[in-house]
């Protein structure tokens, strides 16, 4: 359980690093996506790449913005390993170890979906680096769509952890106030999943609401914080080993 605590803590800190690295001017983007990094994830042509690199107040692509996006991709390789570990090793495996059949099924779905999302994310980062280098052999859109689809599905299935509360994670029983926050975390994950999938569908079908996709994933924030607290309480409650 101590390992889970440290993994979650590193994941949260790296997510903060990723958020800071993604800060920058709004760009012309694609279908309402103003964040340059996210806009690049859905680029499928040279004009899409140029729009993702062009601030909305400028006419030509910004070379400094291009270097920022390149740096984001290398940071993202670490982030992929971290979020896969959190969802697979902590959330998915905890549900699989539950005696309830429904929890085990949802746990396997979490593990499968986050694995597909992580693989697609790696390929997406590679495609972005190729596109920024002038290559046109593969486009980020081909991998960005499945990545976000399976990531949002993972969020939805992961909500089960906060409703079913398997003993491997919730060994220390939450108090009334904390219990309410745990349930709220499950609701947030389901809401983020639904909003993200809806935004992705609108983006693909009518080139609208692309700006919803990124913020929907931020709803994992409270659940992660609560898991950090819960894992800390769990290992603090363990009796000291006598030597």
Enumerate the predicted regions with their spans:
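Interfacial helix-loop-helix junctions of multi-pass membrane proteins
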Residues: 125-141, 207-211
């Amino acid at each position: 359980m101590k390992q889970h605590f440290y993994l979650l803590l590193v994941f949260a800190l790296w997510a903060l690093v990723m958020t800071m690295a993604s800060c920058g001017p709004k760009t012309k983007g694609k279908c309402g996506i103003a964040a340059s990094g996210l806009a690049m994830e859905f680029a499928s042509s040279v004009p899409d790449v140029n729009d993702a690199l062009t601030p909305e107040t400028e006419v030509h692509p910004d070379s400094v913005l291009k270097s920022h996006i390149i740096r984001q991709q290398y940071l993202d390789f670490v982030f992929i390993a971290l979020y896969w570990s959190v969802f697979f090793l902590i959330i998915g495996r905890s549900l699989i170890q539950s005696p309830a059949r429904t929890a085990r099924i949802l746990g396997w779905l979490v593990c499968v979906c986050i694995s597909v999302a992580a693989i697609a994310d790696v390929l997406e980062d590679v495609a972005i680096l190729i596109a920024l280098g002038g290559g046109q052999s593969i486009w980020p859109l081909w991998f960005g769509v499945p990545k976000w689809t399976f990531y949002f599905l993972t969020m939805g299935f992961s909500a089960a952890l906060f409703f079913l509360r398997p003993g491997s994670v919730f060994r220390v029983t939450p108090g009334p106030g904390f219990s309410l926050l745990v349930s709220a975390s499950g609701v947030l994950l389901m809401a983020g999943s639904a909003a993200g999938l809806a935004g992705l569908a609108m983006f693909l079908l009518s080139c609208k609401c692309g700006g919803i996709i990124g913020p929907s994933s931020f709803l994992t924030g409270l659940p992660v914080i609560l898991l950090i607290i819960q894992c800390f309480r769990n290992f603090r409650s363990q009796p000291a080993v006598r030597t």
